[in-house]
């Protein structure tokens, strides 16, 4: 019974990935014969695929042997009811969007499903990670700490928010090729830089005190190149102190000029100004072009500069925070 339920969840997951990447794909419940005429296949609607995915998840959820979460590491690659709920939430929301709904109003359906998913996940032990355990290491920023954790499996894990995450690191050996080596700031001793946050991403983080956007969303910029921001006068934003008072997710995600960081156990700051320890440059493969570096999922203190290696946070496929956002979007619509 459990194996069959997991097969339904896995089929739902892979169909959802195909749907997101390639659009609607033929719905086939039986294997093809060797002489099958593939020219007879037809592409269904997005809604058809989404409902098929939701149905698979709901079949799996009926199993009394499929657990809500994994409790032992030797089952870390297996499926759960939590994963089924997350896929069910995503499939219905995507189908209801204007881009995919084919002119039909599916928001009531999506809202009903997402409300149920959120309620059942919360009732079965999932909760947001809101309290920082190591306040000194992560500056009392629970969001920063959360994405460095790799302990969501167990009967009472410290991370109860993660529904499903990668079992592997970003490289074959994360101890020799951790995140800071490929996307970190030079002050950490990075070997190369593969991505950098844009100014537009930085501008997207609201002000914490007011909850208002930094820019006037009716016209965020005064020019096509986005070099002249059009500030929201009611946000409380101070252009002379641009990083103060922002949504805490900003500090948890991005290194900016004067960001605090640990080199091993020694406190330091990231300097992105010309001449700084992680200066902005227009050439080379180690320094930012935008004045920002990626921080999310990096364990604070791990860095080549201090000779401290270790595993970073794994990529989350699904987490409760995302289900909250899905439910909120469906409710608003």
Protein language model annotation of sequence segments:
Residues 1-196, 303-320, 333:
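Structured, solvent-exposed acidic/aromatic patches
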Residues 29-32, 70, 209, 254, ...:
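Solvent-exposed, flexible loop/coil residues
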Residues 65, 104-106, 140-143, 161, ...:
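Intrinsically disordered regions, especially transient/low-confidence alpha-helical propensity segments
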Residues 126-152, 192-234, 280-284:
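Charged, glycine/proline-rich intrinsically disordered loops and linkers
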Residues 167, 204, 208, 253:
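Residues that form generic nucleotide/phosphate-binding pockets
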Residues 220-319:
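Flexible, polar/acidic helix-loop-strand segments at domain edges
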Residues 328:
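Active-site-proximal region of nucleotide-activated glycan assembly enzymes
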């Amino acid at each position: 019974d459990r194996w069959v339920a997991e097969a339904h969840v896995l089929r739902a997951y892979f169909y959802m990935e195909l749907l997101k990447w390639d659009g609607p794909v033929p719905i086939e419940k039986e294997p093809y014969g060797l002489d099958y005429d593939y020219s007879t296949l037809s592409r269904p609607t997005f809604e058809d695929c989404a409902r098929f995915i939701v149905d698979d998840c709901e079949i799996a959820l009926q199993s009394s042997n499929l657990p809500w979460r994994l409790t032992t590491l030797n089952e870390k690659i297996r499926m759960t009811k939590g994963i089924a709920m997350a896929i069910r939430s995503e499939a219905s929301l995507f189908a209801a969007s204007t881009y995919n709904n084919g002119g039909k109003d599916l928001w009531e359906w999506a809202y009903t499903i997402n409300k149920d998913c959120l309620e059942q996940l919360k009732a079965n032990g999932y909760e947001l990670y809101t309290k920082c355990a190591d306040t000194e290491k992560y500056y009392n920023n629970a969001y920063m700490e959360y994405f460095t954790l790799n302990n969501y499996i167990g009967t009472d894990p410290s991370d109860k928010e993660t529904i499903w995450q990668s079992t592997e690191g970003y490289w074959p050996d994360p101890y020799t090729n951790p995140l800071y080596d490929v996307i970190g700031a030079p002050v950490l001793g990075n070997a190369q830089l593969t991505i950098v946050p844009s100014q537009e991403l930085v501008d997207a983080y609201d002000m914490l005190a007011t909850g208002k956007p930094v820019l006037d969303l009716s016209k965020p910029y005064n020019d096509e190149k986005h070099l002249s921001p059009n500030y929201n006068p009611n946000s409380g934003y101070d252009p002379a102190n641009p990083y103060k008072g922002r949504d805490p997710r900003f500090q948890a995600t991005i290194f900016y000029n004067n960001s605090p960081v640990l080199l091993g156990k020694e406190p330091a700051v990231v300097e992105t100004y010309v001449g700084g320890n992680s200066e902005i440059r227009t050439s080379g493969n180690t320094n930012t072009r935008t004045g920002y570096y990626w921080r999310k999922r990096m364990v604070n203190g791990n860095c080549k500069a201090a000779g401290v290696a270790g595993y970073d946070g794994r990529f989350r496929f699904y987490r409760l925070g995302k289900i909250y956002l899905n439910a909120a979007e469906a409710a608003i619509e």
